[in-house]
Swiss-Prot record:
It comes from Rhodobacter capsulatus (strain ATCC BAA-309 / NBRC 16581 / SB1003). Not required for the biogenesis of c-type cytochromes. Signal peptide: none annotated. InterPro entries: MTH938-like_sf, NDUFAF3/AAMDC. Pfam families: DUF498. This is Uncharacterized protein RCAP_rcc01784. PANTHER family: NADH DEHYDROGENASE [UBIQUINONE] 1 ALPHA SUBCOMPLEX ASSEMBLY FACTOR 3, NUCLEAR PROTEIN E3-3.
Length: 124
């Protein structure tokens, strides 16, 4: 049986990532990223609560990329998002990017809040 390419039905997958950047639909985004099926936008981190609250009704699950390693979400954030109907799962940024693409290809209402990966940021 030949492997099947994932289908995204017009949604925005993460094409690639590296130290300090993400590639979405051929465009490079530097720094943090907030993405769901219909939009990708710069994100400054967990202090930007308005952007996370705006996901209510658009996503059921928010994958939180915490950088190179898994870490706890800021205190109270998970409870606040759950009250809005958004389940939040912290994991490393690399894991969050991969899981986002898999769930998106399944047609799930998923988003990702991704802190950039550490390391030297390419200039070109």
């Amino acid at each position: 049986m030949a492997p099947r390419e994932p289908g995204f039905a017009g949604a925005l997958p993460i094409d690639g990532y590296g130290p300090g950047f993400f590639r979405i639909a051929g465009a490079v985004h530097r720094g943090g990223l907030l993405i769901h099926a219909e939009a990708a936008m710069p994100w400054t981190g967990f202090d930007d609560l308005a952007a996370l609250r705006a996901l209510a009704g658009q996503v059921d699950l928010l994958l939180c990329g915490m950088g190179a390693d898994i870490a706890h979400l800021p205190k109270g954030l998970q409870v606040e998002l759950e009250a809005l109907g958004v389940m939040a799962e912290p994991m490393s940024t690399a894991s969050a990017a991969r899981h986002y693409n898999v769930l998106l290809s399944e047609g799930r209402r998923v988003g990702a809040a991704l802190l950039p990966m550490p390391g030297a940021v390419p200039t070109a």
